[in-house]
Amino acid sequence: MEIGQYQPNLEGDGLRIGIVQSRFNEPVCNGLADACVEELERLGVSGEDVLLVSVPGALEIPLALQKLAESGQFDALIALGAVIRGETYHFELVSNESGAGITRIGLDFNLPIANAVLTTENDKQAVARMTEKGRDAARVAVEMANLTMALDQLGDDEDEEEDEEDEEERA
C-alpha cells in the first residue's frame, strides 16, 4: 500500500515568528533567546519577521502569547523561560501552569507554539541546556508553521473540488 507522507520543512523564509521570553533567571533566558534567534536566521527567517517581547516570569508567558496570537500576525510562536527548582512547591506550580497555558493558547488559536521553558533542578542544568533548547525551539516553530500551513491547504483543496463540482452541476 502506498501512503501519502509530508516531509518536514525547515525553510523559514517568509515566516513570521513571535517570541515571548521570561526575564526571571535572565542569564539562562538570554542564552535561550540568543540561540533561538541565531537558529531562526540560519533557517532563513528574516529579522524583520521576528518580534521578541519579554515578560517578568514564566507565568506571564501565556498571556503575552495569547495577545500575539490574537493579532493574527504570526505563523508560529516561541515561549522561552527557565524555571529552576527551589525549596518550595512553587516550582511545580509555575512549571505546570505555564506549560498548560502555553499548550492551551496554541490549541485555542490553532497556532504552533514551541515551548522552550526549561524546568531544571539547578542552574547548572539550565545553563547546560539553554543553547540546544533555544535552537530546538526555532526548528520546532519553523517546522510546525510549515506543517500547519500544508495541512490547512488540505481543506482548501477539497473546497476547490466541491466548488468545481457545484459549478458543473449548475451548467
Swiss-Prot record:
Which reactions does this protein catalyse? (2S)-2-hydroxy-3-oxobutyl phosphate + 5-amino-6-(D-ribitylamino)uracil = 6,7-dimethyl-8-(1-D-ribityl)lumazine + phosphate + 2 H2O + H(+)
Region Disordered: start-end pairs: 150-171
Pfam family name, one = DMRL_synthase
Q: Where is the sequence biased in composition, kind Acidic residues?
A: 154-171
Binding positions for 5-amino-6-(D-ribitylamino)uracil per the UniProt entry: F24, A58, L59, E60, A82, V83, I84, N115
UniProt KW DNA repair keyword = no
The first-level EC class reads transferase
Q: Which domain of life is it from?
A: Bacteria
| Entry's EC annotation | 2.5.1.78
Residue positions of the active site: H90
Alphabetically list the UniProt keywords: Riboflavin biosynthesis, Transferase
GO biological process per UniProt: riboflavin biosynthetic process
**Record Gene3D superfamilies:** Lumazine/riboflavin synthase (3.40.50.960)
Q: Which InterPro entries did the record assign?
A: LS, LS/RS, LS/RS_sf
The Swiss-Prot or TrEMBL record annotates one GO molecular function as: 6,7-dimethyl-8-ribityllumazine synthase activity
List ligand-binding residues for (2S)-2-hydroxy-3-oxobutyl phosphate: E87, T88, R129
* Cellular component, GO annotation: cytosol; riboflavin synthase complex
Which pathway does the UniProt entry assign to this protein?
Cofactor biosynthesis; riboflavin biosynthesis; riboflavin from 2-hydroxy-3-oxobutyl phosphate and 5-amino-6-(D-ribitylamino)uracil: step 1/2
Family in the record:
Belongs to the DMRL synthase family.
Q: What does this protein do?
A: Catalyzes the formation of 6,7-dimethyl-8-ribityllumazine by condensation of 5-amino-6-(D-ribitylamino)uracil with 3,4-dihydroxy-2-butanone 4-phosphate. This is the penultimate step in the biosynthesis of riboflavin.
Instruction: Write down what this protein is called.
Output: 6,7-dimethyl-8-ribityllumazine synthase
